Amino acid sequence: MIFQSYLLIAASMFCIGLYGLLTSRNVVRVLMSLELLLNAVNLNLLTFSNFVDSHEMKGQVLALFVIALAAAEAAIGLAIILSIYRNQRTVDPEQFNLLKW
């Protein structure tokens, strides 16, 4: 029963993150939704690692690796968003035209 509840929580987190990723018009919300997606993946990794083969540490190691990548992605993403906000005065992705000719 606990296994299914963890998977249900991870699936709901993933769906909420995907909804926020697809519908948000604010780049900060998109970044937060992406982090929620990665946390749902981590919860799935840890759940399967714990319940399928509790003696192997592969799921935990991969989850730590994903957490480290998510932290780097958040830092770089926020730095880019801050730079764009200073230049454009908006965080609406429809208004970004930095790469257009």
Curated annotation (Swiss-Prot):
GO biological process assignments: ATP synthesis coupled electron transport; photosynthesis, light reaction
Source taxon at top rank: Eukaryota
Xref: InterPro entries: NADH_UbQ_OxRdtase_chain4L/K, NUOK/Mnh_C1-like
Disulfide bonding pattern of the chain: none
GO CC, one annotated term: NADH dehydrogenase complex
Reaction equation(s) it catalyzes: a plastoquinone + NADH + (n+1) H(+)(in) = a plastoquinol + NAD(+) + n H(+)(out); a plastoquinone + NADPH + (n+1) H(+)(in) = a plastoquinol + NADP(+) + n H(+)(out)
Gene3D superfamilies: 1.10.287.3510
Gene Ontology terms, MF aspect: oxidoreductase activity, acting on NAD(P)H, quinone or similar compound as acceptor; quinone binding
Keywords: Chloroplast, Membrane, NAD, NADP, Plastid, Plastoquinone, Quinone, Thylakoid, Translocase, Transmembrane, Transmembrane helix, Transport
Residues passing through the membrane, by range: 2-22, 32-52, 61-81
Annotated family: Belongs to the complex I subunit 4L family.
Purpose: NDH shuttles electrons from NAD(P)H:plastoquinone, via FMN and iron-sulfur (Fe-S) centers, to quinones in the photosynthetic chain and possibly in a chloroplast respiratory chain. The immediate electron acceptor for the enzyme in this species is believed to be plastoquinone. Couples the redox reaction to proton translocation, and thus conserves the redox energy in a proton gradient.
Protein name, entry field: NAD(P)H-quinone oxidoreductase subunit 4L, chloroplastic
Native source organism of the sequence: Nephroselmis olivacea (Green alga)
